[in-house]
Curated annotation (Swiss-Prot):
Pfam families: Pkinase. The gene is TOS3. This is Serine/threonine-protein kinase TOS3. Gene3D superfamilies: Transferase(Phosphotransferase) domain 1 (1.10.510.10). InterPro entries: Aur-like, Kinase-like_dom_sf, Prot_kinase_dom, Protein_kinase_ATP_BS, Ser/Thr_kinase_AS. It comes from the Eukaryota. It catalyses: L-seryl-[protein] + ATP = O-phospho-L-seryl-[protein] + ADP + H(+); L-threonyl-[protein] + ATP = O-phospho-L-threonyl-[protein] + ADP + H(+). GO terms for molecular function: ATP binding; protein kinase activity; protein serine kinase activity; protein serine/threonine kinase activity. The keyword Transferase applies. PANTHER family: SERINE/THREONINE-PROTEIN KINASE IAL-RELATED.
């Protein structure tokens, strides 16, 4: 059980609550060079000085990884942001900077408060397509208010939290919001999943991907007008304020937006369901704008985790929510008034001297200690490879036996029962039937890159003239089962492969004298694709056998 902190008291103006942006940003390390390595023994990637341990979450604007600082042993969270936007109709050569990346960085640079997740370091290599934010790690994870087996959008209550547990969460969030608003920052996406709990029970506001700033003095922060034009499409619709849902009148980007989403959050924590819900976006917006606020009855509340609440406490909770979820933003309650509201100050019979959280609700992720394995040579990976990137599905499932040099593979191969004309060494065979990806076309002819990243799987006999066709995003993947061919997909045309045959031969070191013939042709992509066109290559190499079936293996390479 984890002890939640006592209610947060208002801080003096000289405290962290009123730290200015310059003091906060000076604490943050900025690194302009990114190096990505792979440890074949631990099967883990290493980003600069951080060993990647696990995936913490996948958001709309980036994936978050758990990592260990190899210098200090401290655990951190690393958020991975795409430097460039994906836009329909653009080729790989035309890249558009993602404005939200700089926006999030500039906002987080201004923040240093105990109830806001802290930014430690920015890994921003101009040559990388990713930007990495090294953040404070909150081991208890996000605040949960409905059972694990229930989708939040379909939750009907009751909440798995008590009123007192919810009150403790809200006090910390109010403290964090008060700080953000004092810095001219509107979070724009306050919701339970963006409220993280540290190991000591402190609740911290996280995820500033859609945050807005009215602060001056930074040229990287978009103007208020630009932010307003984009804000209606960003965030979580179920937590949108009415002024975000209506297009009939203009609105200003104000702290009232966060007050409303805080009200929706408190409603979820107390009653275990969303205050406004619908089957479609338009219905949801209409409900938020026009539907009156409703509450479960006191009798219903007594059947859930809140069975110990008093009628007075229940009445105070409803009164606070009515003031938070006020349709008119000008009439919404202020943060200072929330802290002194009777519900926040009330202590009923459900309270105790110390409030313990439910381990099922706020469990702490267990992380194994650093490995004490012997020294191993790390494999250097290209930083822009879709295969090697930290948010790649290939790398997350990658088999470390796949990372071997040509010499290693040859030394471990013993012909034994295999025919000399059949490619069957165990080091080659069936590495999860996964494709390998590369950062540039030149890597197809690079012996080191190719030797360390290959995927080989059984293919039908040559007599079977069928084709295997599958989709991969915006590309049409063609793995022909005809005689050996090399297929390339490109928005610009065919590539010459005169030198490829020699490079492949020397790199793969096939068993026996096997003729290898490679040809290339262009395959058209899907015309209605909304994603960027992608270059894809599939090489099928035939290794003839002496048996009647003419057994063969297929090797596939992909640049995604």
């Amino acid at each position: 059980m984890v002890l939640l902190k006592e209610p947060v008291q208002p801080l003096p103006r000289s405290s962290l609550l009123y730290n200015n942006a310059s003091n906060s940003s000076s604490r943050i390390k900025e690194t302009r060079k990114v190096k990505l390595l792979y440890n074949p023994l631990t099967k883990r990637q290493i980003l600069n000085n951080f060993e990647i341990l696990a995936t913490l979450g996948n958001g709309q604007y980036g994936k978050v990884k758990l990592a260990r600082d190899l210098g200090t042993g401290a655990l951190v969270a690393i958020k991975i942001l795409n430097r460039f936007e994906k836009r329909s109709g653009y080729s790989l050569q035309l890249k558009v900077e993602n404005p939200r990346v700089n926006q999030e960085i500039e906002v987080m640079k201004r923040c240093h408060h105990e109830n806001v997740v802290e930014l430690y370091e920015i890994l921003n290599d101009p040559e990388s397509t990713k930007v990495y934010l090294v953040l404070e790690y909150c081991s208890r994870g996000p605040v949960k208010w409905c059972p694990e087996n229930k989708m939040e959008i379909k939750a009907v209550g009751p909440s798995i939290l008590t009123f007192q547990q919810s009150r403790k969460v809200v006090l910390d969030v109010v403290s964090g919001l008060e700080y953000l608003h004092s810095q001219g920052i509107t979070h724009r996406d306050i919701k339970p999943s963006n409220l993280l709990i540290s190991s000591n029970g402190t609740v911290k506001i996280s995820d500033f991907g859609v945050a807005m700033s009215t602060a001056t003095g930074s040229t990287n922060i978009q103007s208020s007008h630009e932010q307003l034009l984009k804000s209606r499409a960003l965030g979580t619709p179920a937590f949108f304020a009415p002024e975000l849902c209506s297009t009939e009148k203009e609105y200003s980007c104000s702290s009232a937006i966060d007050i409303w989403s805080l009200g929706v959050t408190i409603y979820c924590l107390l009653f275990g369901k969303l205050p406004f819900n619908a089957n479609s976006g338009l219905e949801l917006f209409d409900s938020i704008i026009n539907k009156p606020l409703e509450f479960p009855s006191y009798e219903e509340m007594l059947n859930g985790a809140t069975s110990g609440i008093t009628m007075e406490e229940y009445t105070d909770a409803k009164d606070l929510l009515k003031k938070l979820l006020q349709k008119d933003p000008d009439k919404r309650i202020k943060l200072a008034d929330i802290k002194v509201h009777p519900f926040m100050c009330h202590y009923g019979k459900s309270d105790a001297a110390s409030v313990l959280t439910n381990l099922e609700t706020f469990h702490e992720l267990k992380v194994s200690p650093p490995s004490s394995c012997k020294r191993v040579e790390l494999v250097s990976l290209p930083v822009n490879s879709s295969f090697a990137s930290l948010d790649s599905v290939y790398m997350e499932n990658f088999d470390h036996n796949n990372l071997r040099t040509g010499a290693d593979r040859n030394s471990t191969y013993s012909p034994s029962i295999y025919d000399a004309n059949t490619l069957s060494p165990s080091a080659y065979h069936n590495i999860g039937s996964r494709e390998s990806s590369y950062s540039s076309f030149s890597s197809f002819t690079s012996s080191t890159a190719f030797a360390s990243q290959i995927s080989i799987q059984d293919a039908p006999a040559i007599g079977d003239q069928q084709c295997l066709i599958g989709e991969s995003g915006s590309s049409l993947r063609v793995n022909s089962c005809e005689f050996p061919q090399y297929t390339t997909m490109s928005p610009v045309g065919e590539y010459p492969f005169e030198s490829t045959e020699a490079s492949l031969s020397s790199t793969l070191t096939p068993v026996g004298n096997v003729p290898q013939r490679i040809k290339a042709h262009l395959v058209e992509g899907k015309s209605n694709s909304k994603d960027d066109l992608r270059i894809e290559a599939d090489a099928s190499l035939v290794f003839e056998a002496s048996d009647a079936q003419r057994t063969r293996r297929r090797m596939s390479l992909y640049k995604l």
